[in-house]
A protein has these predicted regions:
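Non-catalytic, mobile gating and regulatory segments of ester bond hydrolases
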Residues: 1-115, 119-241
């Protein structure tokens, strides 16, 4: 999947943070209509259909003003998931709030894309695992680690996992806690170009990026890089592949 396609999903993930009235207008501007809005105990998602009749399920990420979102992020224990392995307790709790309604809404849909940012990326990953036969692709931005090795190996969905340079959320929960990442890792460097780097090369690249950012007055690059607007800005640089 190339930057123009990823940018579409990035915009959808960003608009998902909006309330329905505002979201409706913004989704329409990019060729999507709202099929259903899910909102249960501050867990939220939109089921959309674009002008080509393709369905997209998008999950809202962490709202720093919502205590339930923060608590979900902090509950780092693991629970068994049906497809195999164990997943983050807090993320599972959030998707479970919406799952009965989502399962019903997609029951007659044969195929769809799934996306989300931050907590929404984790929820999107778990949801995709529960309906793997329907998912054309999972596209996530700034995703934390969701489950253990067994769980990750149980996921067969095509997953484009986009990381913006020093995004701190992509580094938690920690590897030492038994959590693993899933999917094709799409790492964007400081300039917005995708780079296929080893783990050690990526660490060196991020150190260089933090030094560059600090000289420009950006002291919290890890938080800055996690912002959805900054994913969109870098994905908009089509010429820097």
């Amino acid at each position: 999947m190339q930057k123009p396609e990823l940018l579409i999903f990035a915009n959808i993930a960003a608009i998902t943070y909006e309330e329905p009235k505002t979201a409706k207008t913004k989704f329409k501007a990019i060729g999507c209509t709202i099929v259903e809005f899910f909102d249960i105990d501050n867990a939220q998602a939109y089921l959309l259909k674009n002008n080509d009749g393709i369905h997209i399920l998008s999950f809202r990420g962490t709202e720093v003003t919502e205590p339930s979102d923060i608590l979900a992020d902090l509950k780092a224990g693991k629970n068994i998931e049906a497809i195999g392995g164990k997943i983050h307790v807090g993320f599972k709790g959030e998707i479970n709030k919406l799952w009965p309604a989502i399962e019903k809404a997609v029951s007659d849909i044969n195929s769809l894309y799934v996306t989300g940012h931050s907590l929404g990326a984790a929820m999107a990953t778990i949801a995709s695992g529960r309906m793997q036969s329907k998912v054309l692709a999972l596209v996530t931005f700034g995703s934390p680690r969701v489950g253990n090795k067994e769980y990750v190996n149980s996921l067969t969905v095509k997953h484009y996992r986009v990381q913006n340079n020093c995004d701190d959320v992509t580094k938690v929960p920690f590897l030492l806690m038994g959590f693993k990442h899933h999917g094709t890792h799409m790492y964007m460097n400081y300039y917005g170009a995708f780079r296929n780097l080893t783990a050690w090369q990526q660490i060196k690249d991020m150190v260089r990026s933090r030094v560059k950012a600090y000289t420009k007055g950006q002291k919290f690059l890890g938080a800055y890089d996690h912002m959805m607007d900054n994913y969109i800005a870098k994905l908009g640089k089509f010429g820097e592949e």
